[in-house]
Amino acid sequence: MRKSLKKLLLLSCALGTVFSTSPTNLYAQSNTATVSHYIVTADNYQLPYDGEEKEFANGINPGYGSGLMFKSLNNDGSIEFYCVTDRGPNGDIPTYIKDGKAYPGKFFPTPKFTPSIGILKIDQNKAQIVDTIPLKDKNNHKISGKVIPFGAIGSTGEVALDFQMNDLGTDVNGLDTEGITRDKDGNFWLCDEYGPFLIKTDSNGKILEKYGPSMGLPSILAQRVPNRGFEGLTIDDDGNIVGIVQSPLDVDGKTSKTAPYTRIVKLNPQTKEVKMYAYPVDKNYKNFSNAKLGDITSIGNDEYLLIEQGKQNGKMQNLIYKVDLKNATTVDTNGDLEYGKVPQNFVPAKKELLLNLRQYGWNIEKAEGLAILPDRQTIAVVNDNDFGIAVKVDDANNNNASVEDYTYDADKKIFLNKNNQQVDIHIGLQQNAPEEQQSQIYLFKLNQKL
């Protein structure tokens, strides 16, 4: 393994560029990094798409960047990671009115998509997905990423539509997976931002256990902002499953913008005990709901690396923090944390800035997968490319049309513009921003071990 690691890191040094961080704190001052960057290809796993857009004639590019875990260093010097997709290609819909009520929702251009685990391999000058493991329910049937039924635990209240505005229905087992780790028995653990849920599967992706609000996890977690549930996952030295809630909870619909903390959740899979800790988000967001965590990975001794990102002072930031829970106090299962009602002895997680990815050439919005190599010096980060797609609207009378400009009346089956006038529009797919289209993996080799 040592020879394999040395070979890989020599390759990284040869391909990378050295950048220096600004003196933000002790870690940031003392660390520089050598950076290697790869486009992740998945030629054998393109998603079938029957739309007419020529950009997707060969299918939709998959996105396996919603979570990352180190897998192995191989004798030939190659390195492998486990990674995971989210719920699949999707995009925002116009305001959707049915029976006089407005609903949020998403377009699902590939509604039969199954959230899947991937194996990402870096070998010589390339990175590629070499295998996949689709997720399956307890009856061994493939699940989907479609929304959960209204009223069920984990429902976001959304409708799932195709581009003809047909309702695609729901999936009680639907998952929007966002993090991955593996236990000592070879079982995978995944997290999801619908529920939020923690999911245990066997090595073939079959679901064995599922935890959610009032289903083994505190009910307060149901008050996550819709689609902002668990965003990252790791396993600590004691075998506890550690998940992070993407953004501050919205308790009673009142706290998402004002609560300066989000939650770290620790589940003991043997005793089922759950502990929660407060993670202090940065202070320079327009409001705290703009803070988004990306992933977490354990570095031992109740210490972790964690991605925090979002616009601060008007500029997009993608930051890696070193987080210490050793002295952190647990928080209650009610909403007191979000309302600022903390006990006198309250101690949140300690955080220290390790890397500002933007200072190392990272120009992508979503850093969502994080892993550390056995050398404790090389950090891997992958992006969520949103499957390389975005929703487009063609309107002969509006050259800058976007879905937010329109309302769809499902009872009358008509589109209306902002002036409440009936319009004839066409909705379909286009490629998203050039810097976002590809799945990418960066290796940051620090100049000192963690």
Predicted features by range, described:
Residues 2-28:
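Sec-dependent N-terminal signal peptides of Gram-positive bacterial secreted proteins and lipoproteins
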Residues 27-450:
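Sequence/structural signature of beta-propeller domains
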